[in-house]
């Protein structure tokens, strides 16, 4: 993986697309819960919200795989060496892991009919939201308190 000064337009687009899709699915996640309850009662789920949730979840999975591949092909900015930089790198790694794990658990629960995966799916989705909040607050702290322009790396392509 090469060290680059910033991110490419593709990497930035993938970052924000994945973030938006994750947020969308989190906000409208109750449609899946209602659909799951209906199926357990042998009733056809109402509406199309659950289908949309599945499609968006699959998109998150595919886009995350593309984003990980892009990291290796296109490179990423050099990582810092401070303890805070190491925490940030760990947080980023967890976000990547969760954006793969949540759709996989969702597919296992819904598509695979494995009810045990529904609880971990929801728990991991909640973890994504918590870590994304920490990630966003940290980026804003860098931009507006430290004034190191770190946030611009994910807004302006190299």
From Swiss-Prot:
Q: Name where it's found.
A: Cell membrane
Cofactor annotation comment: Binds 2 heme b (iron-protoporphyrin IX) groups per molecule.
Cofactors named for this entry: heme b
Q: Which UniProt keywords apply?
A: Cell membrane, Electron transport, Heme, Iron, Membrane, Metal-binding, Transmembrane, Transmembrane helix, Transport
Q: Which GO terms describe its molecular function?
A: electron transfer activity; heme binding; metal ion binding
Q: Which InterPro entries match?
A: Cyt_b561_bac/Ni-Hgenase, Cytochrome_b561_oxidase, Di-haem_cyt_TM
Membrane-traversing stretches? 12-32, 46-66, 87-107, 121-141
* List of residues binding heme b 2: 53, 121
| Signal peptide extent | none
Specify the protein's topology with respect to the membrane: Multi-pass membrane protein
Q: Which GO terms describe its biological process?
A: respiratory electron transport chain
Entry superkingdom: Bacteria
Q: Which residues take part in binding heme b 1?
A: 15, 135
Protein family according to the UniProt entry: Belongs to the cytochrome b561 family.
General function of this protein: Cytochrome b562 is an integral component of the cytochrome b-c1 complex in the cyclic electron transfer system of photosynthetic bacteria.
Summary of subunit composition and partner proteins:
Homodimer.
Q: What is this protein called?
A: Cytochrome b562
Where is the organism placed in the taxonomic lineage, from the top?
Bacteria, Pseudomonadati, Pseudomonadota, Alphaproteobacteria, Rhodobacterales
């Amino acid at each position: 993986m090469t060290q680059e000064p910033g991110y490419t337009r593709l990497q930035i687009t993938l970052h924000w697309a994945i973030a938006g899709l994750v947020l969308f699915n989190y906000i409208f996640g109750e449609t899946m819960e209602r659909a799951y309850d209906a199926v357990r009662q042998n009733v056809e789920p109402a509406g199309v919200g659950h289908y949309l949730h599945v499609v968006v979840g699959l998109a998150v999975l595919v886009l995350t795989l593309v984003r990980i591949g892009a990291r290796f092909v296109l490179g990423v900015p050099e990582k810092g060496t401070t303890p805070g930089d190491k925490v940030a790198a760990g947080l980023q790694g967890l976000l990547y892991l969760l954006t793969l794990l949540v759709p996989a658990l969702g597919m296992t629960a819904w598509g695979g009919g494995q009810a045990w995966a529904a609880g971990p799916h929801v728990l991991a989705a909640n973890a994504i939201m918590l870590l994304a909040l920490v990630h966003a607050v940290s980026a804003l702290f860098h931009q507006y308190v430290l004034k190191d322009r770190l946030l611009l790396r994910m807004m302006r392509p190299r």
